[in-house]
Amino acid sequence: MKLTAVLMVAVLVLTACQLITANECSRKGEWCGLESVLCCNGGSWNCWFVCTA
């Protein structure tokens, strides 16, 4: 049961992080995959893991 709770919290944190990152990227007029440290380090897949990288 504890493991499930930990996983749920991790997913919520990562999702919030993804949304914040996406907002930050669009504010700067950049998109996932373009060269920018905040906007995903050059790979659209990395965009979703920018907070853990």
From Swiss-Prot:
Entry superkingdom: Eukaryota
Keyword Secreted: yes
UniProt keyword Signal present: yes
Signal peptide (residue range): 1-22
GO MF term set: toxin activity
Compartment annotation: Secreted
Principal location class: secreted
Disulfide bonds listed in the record: 25-40, 32-47, 39-51
UniProt keyword annotations, A-Z: Disulfide bond, Knottin, Neurotoxin, Secreted, Signal, Toxin
GO terms for cellular component: extracellular region
Tissue specificity as recorded in UniProt: Expressed by the venom duct.
UniProt function note: Probable neurotoxin.
Family, as annotated: Belongs to the conotoxin O1 superfamily.
Domains (record comment): The cysteine framework is VI/VII (C-C-CC-C-C).
Protein name: Conotoxin Cal6.23
